[in-house]
A protein has these predicted regions:
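Active-site microenvironment for binding and transforming phosphate-containing groups
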Residues: 1-257
Length: 257
């Protein structure tokens, strides 16, 4: 049984369904147990297909109407009006639609999934916001594409899903320098336990800051850390620290009914 996390600011909207899905309720095994929705993983393709079908059914969408992207940690947002197969998914990091019954989604395993909706224009979006994409402007690109489809930013509600927490996100000096280059205000997203320690980066806070700067109507942030909650979430960083061969991807999706 699927039990996605829902954001209050989106679940209260008529005609919009969404979910930040956890790793539970699927058919995959091993490293991918159990709701791995990533076609780019080395999981059994039939398992990934069944997991994605379960998500689509939960949202009331047809199995072919769950749209994900070939994510590249960039700032490209695009609009879709009809089904796109997992094999033909376009390279982008945010997807927008105003087509009823078409569920737009992103895959994550530590990066921030962001779901957005303008209930009046009936335009929804899903964005994949890692630090690189967020710094490059993926949030701003998603909002701009929503506006091209008739949304107004002062009506847009946004929810940030489960992301790696600051306590688990240790970064090196080059990372810090890149984020501070030309924007000293980003310093507030870095924390050091002591003067000699490596900084820890607040990715969900950084994404929330970009959403706030975009002037949206409401922003909600989910607090669970993907790294620290192994029974609930996949985590790329955790898999790297354990030298595991691969990792699963959880999905976040939104649809206009």
């Amino acid at each position: 049984m699927l039990q996605p996390i829902e954001a209050r600011c989106l679940s209260s909207l008529p005609g919009v369904r969404h979910g930040f899905f956890t790793r539970g309720g699927g058919v995959s095994g091993g490293l991918y147990a159990s709701l791995n929705c990533g076609p780019g993983s080395s999981d059994e393709p039939s398992h990934v297909a069944e997991n994605r079908a379960r998500v689509a059914r939960h949202l009331g969408a047809g199995e072919a109407n769950l749209i994900t992207l070939y994510q590249v940690h960039g700032a490209t947002a695009l609009c879709v009006e009809g089904p796109v197969t997992a094999q033909d998914r376009p390279k982008a990091d945010a997807v927008v639609t105003r087509t009823p019954g078409l569920a737009v989604a992103v895959l994550t395993a530590d990066c921030a999934p962001v779901l957005l909706a303008d209930p009046e224009a009936r335009v929804v979006a899903a964005a994949h916001a890692g630090w690189r994409g967020a710094a490059a402007g993926i949030i701003e690109s998603a909002v701009a594409e929503m506006e091209r489809q008739g949304a107004q930013r002062e009506r847009i509600r946004a929810a940030i899903g489960p992301t790696i927490g600051q306590g688990a996100y240790e970064v090196g000096p080059d990372f810090e320098a890149e984020l501070l280059k030309g924007c000293a205000g980003n310093e507030k997203y870095f924390l050091r336990i002591n003067a000699n320690a490596r900084a820890r980066f607040d990715l969900p806070g950084f994404v929330e800051g970009r959403l706030a700067a975009a002037g949206l109507a409401e922003i909600e942030r989910q607090s669970p850390c993907t790294y620290e909650n192994e029974s609930i979430f996949f985590s790329f960083r955790r898999s790297q620290h354990r030298k595991e061969a691969d990792y699963g991807r959880q999905i976040a999706a939104i649809v206009v009914t």
